[in-house]
A protein has these predicted regions:
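Glycine/proline-rich active-site loop of Rossmann-fold NAD(P)-dependent oxidoreductases
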Residues: 121, 157, 173-178, 204-213
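Conserved beta-loop-beta element that borders a ligand/cofactor-binding pocket
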Residues: 150-172
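N-terminal Rossmann NAD(P)H-binding glycine-rich loop of SDR-like oxidoreductase domains
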Residues: 10-32
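N-terminal Rossmann-like NAD(P) cofactor-binding module of classical short-chain dehydrogenase/reductase
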Residues: 71, 75-78, 112
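Conserved Rossmann-fold cofactor-binding substructure of NAD(P)-dependent oxidoreductases
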Residues: 55-74
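Substrate-positioning beta->alpha
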Residues: 144, 190-202
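NAD(P)-cofactor binding segment of oxidoreductase domains
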Residues: 84-111, 147
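N-terminal Rossmann-fold cofactor-binding loop
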Residues: 39-44, 60-61
Length: 219
């Protein structure tokens, strides 16, 4: 972790807050006393998110202007977005472009993006999804995340991003331990509790330790 913790004094916006990982991040951020803006496509479906310290807003994360308006006044942003309604390469490419542009306009410098395990390397330059035996049904989803990572790498150096990538087994039911390991963009382990993934994400908000890179996390 960073030796000089960052004070997230203006709160954090969580794009994709209505999903399971997004909700876990909101819960962990509030546990630490952070003010949270929960950005979702349809607030009516996620009214339970609103509460003390949590503002619920509508945002199209593929629209740079909407991202900028939503992120304005915040210290940092988290992206846990997903949709089954748009091809993954289109959605994640557009999302990354909108986040880069919108956060730049809003002058939000820190972005923590949650990635997927299949983009991690099994050998230098070879991702899990490059294996010929990788299921074709999941390839487009993984390639969409890989495209988003490429767009972040191409972004202006002013955006301090990190892609936090859990293992394939993201255990949503397991109790959190508050502990996790980190590594580079290689497969690190087999499992992590969703609650501990959220801890790792919020740690990268409050005490940024990784900058403009993909990392793996595992139990």
């Amino acid at each position: 972790m960073s030796s000089t913790p960052r004070q997230v004094d203006r709160g954090v916006v969580v794009f994709g807050a209505g999903g399971q990982v997004g909700r876990a991040v909101v819960t962990e951020a509030r546990r630490r006393g952070l003010a949270v803006t929960a950005a979702v496509r349809d607030p009516e479906r996620h009214r339970d998110l609103a509460g003390e310290g949590v503002s619920l807003v509508r945002c199209d994360v593929t629209d740079p202007a909407a991202v900028a308006a939503t992120a304005h006044g915040h210290t940092a942003a988290v992206s846990t977005v997903y949709t089954p309604d748009v091809p993954s390469t289109d959605f994640y490419g557009a999302t990354a472009d909108a986040l880069v542009a919108g956060l730049g306009t809003a002058r939000v410098r820190r972005l923590v993006h949650v990635g997927v395990a299949t983009t991690l390397e099994t050998a230098p330059g070879t991702a899990v999804h490059d294996d010929p035996a990788f299921p074709e049904a999941y390839r487009a989803f993984s390639l969409g995340h890989a495209l988003a990572l490429d767009r972040l790498r191409e972004s202006d150096a002013a955006l301090d991003w990190v892609v936090v990538t859990p293992p394939l087994d993201l255990d949503r039911a397991a109790p959190g331990t508050g502990r996790y390991r980190t590594g580079g963009p290689q497969v690190l382990g087999e499992r992590i509790a969703q609650a501990d993934l959220a801890v790792a994400v919020v740690d990268e908000l409050t005490a940024p330790a990784h900058h403009r890179e993909q990392i793996a996390v595992a139990e």
